[in-house]
Design a protein with these regions (language model features):
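Sec-dependent bacterial lipoprotein signal peptides
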Residues: 2-32
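A "functional boundary" signal
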Residues: 34-308
């Protein structure tokens, strides 16, 4: 009996010692992992606010003193979030030294959302400077690094398509827009690739196809009452009907665009309105709208009156 009781005790002690050893290993791995994770609650707070309240996220990030003293993981996220917040708040990104901190930390080998975002915003920095080919390279890297198909991936494709379109590569631009649309199908954000697809058809003089996709884009914009996009699409309709010489319908759409657009957005709309009035042989109205658009042009670009 004693002999049989002795074995369980021995095994119990052995099991306990193994458990302690494994626990120590797991603890060290956990601590190692934690050392490379973000510690700043301000960064995590800014990250959580970024999509809906980018202005609040920017305020939080700008409140961080001495970001250069943050741990490496925190510095990388700070660089990424600050670039993202500036971009979302329409603030110039400047040079690429900030975002490169994030790019170097997150790398380009392992798929992760932050790695993809780092390369995307590096591309946005290049695009801001007019380096389209470098922007395309970084957008493609961002696509490769994205681990999931979501709205952010669709946005990358949409921006990639715009780059291709600028370079006159309409076929690959169309492919990128369609990929973005497939990812977003059924969501309100599909308005962007739909308008992009329509724009390519318009540039290829396929006006009926352009009208079809502009209508789909308009339907999406109306559902969410995106006034900026609604005004832009009304303007698109007016341009097509003006080219089709259907000046009555062109005037209807440009009038809708002007009603929806804000003062700063309406300069090109007033200029198109003047052209449509001229085509309708309403010369006094054409002169009125042409002269009306000039102060807006001057407000938006005080150094140039060439458009007026």
């Amino acid at each position: 009996m004693k002999t049989r009781c002795c074995y369980p005790k021995r095994y119990l002690l052995l099991f306990f010692s193994l458990l302690v050893s494994v626990g120590s290993i797991l603890m060290s791995v956990s601590l190692s992992s934690c050392s490379s994770s973000v510690k700043s609650p301000l960064l995590l707070s800014a990250d959580s606010l970024m999509e809906i309240y980018p202005d609040s996220a920017l305020s939080i990030l700008e409140s961080i003193s001495s970001p250069q003293k943050l741990p490496r993981a925190d510095r990388a996220l700070y660089a990424l979030l600050l670039t993202q917040a500036r971009h979302k708040n329409y603030i110039a990104l400047g040079d690429d030294s900030l975002i490169k901190t994030a790019v170097e930390y997150y790398g380009d080998k392992k798929k992760s959302v932050r790695a993809a975002k780092a390369h995307y915003y590096w591309g946005a920095t290049y695009l801001e400077k007019g380096y389209t080919s470098f922007a395309v390279e970084e957008y493609l890297a961002a696509i490769r690094l994205m681990p999931i198909r979501n709205e952010f991936l669709a946005m990358i494709y949409d921006n990639l398509a715009e780059c291709y379109e600028k370079d006159g590569l309409n076929n690959v631009a169309m492919e990128a827009y369609r990929t973005a649309y497939q990812i977003l199908e059924g969501e309100s954000a599909q308005v962007y690739p739909l308008r992009g697809i329509a724009g390519i058809f318009f540039s290829q003089n396929e006006k009926d196809s352009a009208l079809y996709y502009y209508q789909q884009a308009l339907d999406c914009a109306l559902v969410v009452q995106d006034s900026s996009m609604i005004g832009a699409i009304y303007h698109d309709f007016a341009m097509i009907y003006n080219e089709k010489k259907d000046y009555i319908r062109a005037d209807q759409y440009i009038s809708k665009a002007i009603m929806v657009m804000g003062h700063d957005e309406a300069a090109n709309a007033y200029l198109l309105k003047a052209e449509i009035m001229f085509n309708l042989n309403k010369l006094d109205s054409a002169s009125y709208f042409f002269n009306y658009c000039c102060p807006i042009k001057l407000d938006n670009n005080k150094n140039s009156v060439l458009d007026c």
